Amino acid sequence: MASLIAEDLQYSYSKQSQSVLKEVSIQLTPGTLTALVGPNGAGKSTLLRLLQGQHIPNNGQITVDGNPLIISRDQVALMPQRGVLNWSFPITVEGLVSLGRVSHSRSTCCELEAALQRVGISDLARRRLDTLSGGQQQRALLAKTLMRPASIFLLDEPCSSLDPPTREQFLIIIRQLADAGLTLFVSSHDWGQALNAYDKVIVLDKTVLASGSPHEVQKRLDSISCMGNHCCD
């Protein structure tokens, strides 16, 4: 299992544009379920893409078990937001999950079955994507991500469009993955969910405002709010 460290990351989409991220430093450890929380436009999706190697930071460095990300990128897998896929495309669950792999090879079939079992949708393998509920589609997308030979998994807003019962089921699944020793980093705009379901919380708004256990982060944010309102004068 692998850990990831990002130090002093800065990123802008062009030399003329303002920085999307400024001096961002985080650490992700195996067996830990970490939430990345922040408002829309805080840079959450951009940070996940940096950590997966899709973007290159203007400054700072990212290492996986002490090695530069550029030589350890296979250790990091990103599950994009559900909206990036065309769910009306005529493909089955097993077709999506095994997409890009050698079809019908013994290893692919075994990995496919293992991924579907881990997210609890083995019985849906031959169902078309457009017949699934939102929660089932999210599980299929997670299963596809788990097909990557990685131990660090970045999930971009996986619960944003799910109803409360389905959200709870999905959180149970990713908790089990973390308990199995994987490194899970999950972006969310749901502060209540982050406080109740995660081991660690990182609050981002272009830079890291707070990081630690849910209790520690809550105290830190209360302190910031208190200072902003001059309640300690």
State what each model feature region is.
Residues 52:
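Helix-to-loop junction immediately C-terminal to a conserved catalytic motif
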Residues 109-124:
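Conserved ABC ATPase "signature" region
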Residues 128-132:
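Conserved ABC ATPase signature
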Residues 153-156:
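Catalytic Walker B motif of ABC-type/P-loop ATPase nucleotide-binding domains
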Residues 188-189:
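H-loop/switch region of ABC-family ATPase nucleotide-binding domains
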